[in-house]
């Protein structure tokens, strides 16, 4: 008889725990938590249309002469990257920034990693510099590995 009471008590504890967890999950989802970027990570919505001007300057200088970047430019870049409200949108903003750099220099949006974007700077080098900015600036990105954005050339991911 005592063992039946223990079993019933244990089952009751499990049921109450499950109900509490379910209520917590329901409350959490009513707050409309966004888990993926979807339509929000677009120029002018999730980040500025002309994003990260300090990061553009930083990446260009890093590409041409690694290690020679002004501390003020580096801090400005990190501030601009951290200011993007949704951490999900940071890699998209960096990818959009790269496309702007390519257009400004007359390079195609997609191309061979060894192709020169501008004098002394290859596409692969500038892409690696941009992709590693979240880790360098110590800002959160939920869609990268070790703080490094990953994307396939020309796709934005």
UniProtKB/Swiss-Prot annotation:
Organism per entry: Oryza sativa subsp. japonica (Rice)
The protein in question is named Alpha-amylase/trypsin inhibitor RA16
Checking PANTHER family in the record gives: SEED ALLERGENIC PROTEIN RAG1 (PTHR34481:SF8), TRYPSIN/FACTOR XIIA INHIBITOR-RELATED (PTHR34481)
User: What GO MF terms are annotated?
Assistant: IgE binding; nutrient reservoir activity; serine-type endopeptidase inhibitor activity
> Which post-translational modifications are recorded for this protein?
Five disulfide bonds are present.
Gene3D superfamilies recorded: Plant lipid-transfer and hydrophobic proteins
Family to which the UniProt record says this protein belongs: Belongs to the cereal trypsin/alpha-amylase inhibitor family.
Record-linked InterPro entries? Allergen/amylase_inhib_rice, Allergen/soft/tryp_amyl_inhib, Allergen/tryp_amyl_inhib_CS, Bifun_inhib/LTP/seed_sf, Bifunc_inhib/LTP/seed_store
- Compartment(s): Secreted
One term under GO cellular component: extracellular region
Disulfide bond positions: 41-89, 55-77, 63-121, 78-137, 91-149
Which range is the signal sequence, renumbered to this chain? 1-26
Which CDD domains does this entry report, sorted A to Z? AAI_SS (cd00261)
Main localisation: secreted
């Amino acid at each position: 008889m005592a063992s039946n009471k223990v079993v019933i008590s244990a089952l009751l504890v499990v049921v109450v725990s499950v109900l509490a967890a379910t209520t917590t999950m329901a409350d959490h989802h009513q707050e409309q938590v966004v888990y993926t970027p979807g339509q929000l990570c677009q120029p002018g919505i999730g980040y500025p249309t002309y994003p990260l001007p300090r990061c553009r300057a930083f990446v260009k200088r890093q590409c041409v002469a690694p290690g020679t970047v002004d501390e003020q430019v580096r801090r400005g870049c990190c501030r601009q990257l951290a200011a993007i409200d949704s951490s999900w949108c940071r890699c998209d903003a960096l990818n959009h920034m790269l496309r702007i750099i390519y257009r400004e220099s007359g390079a195609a949006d997609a191309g061979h990693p060894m192709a020169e974007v501008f004098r002394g700077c290859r596409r692969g080098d500038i892409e690696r510099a941009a992709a590693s900015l979240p880790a360098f600036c110590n800002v959160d990105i939920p869609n990268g590995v070790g703080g490094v954005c990953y994307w396939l050339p020309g796709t934005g991911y």
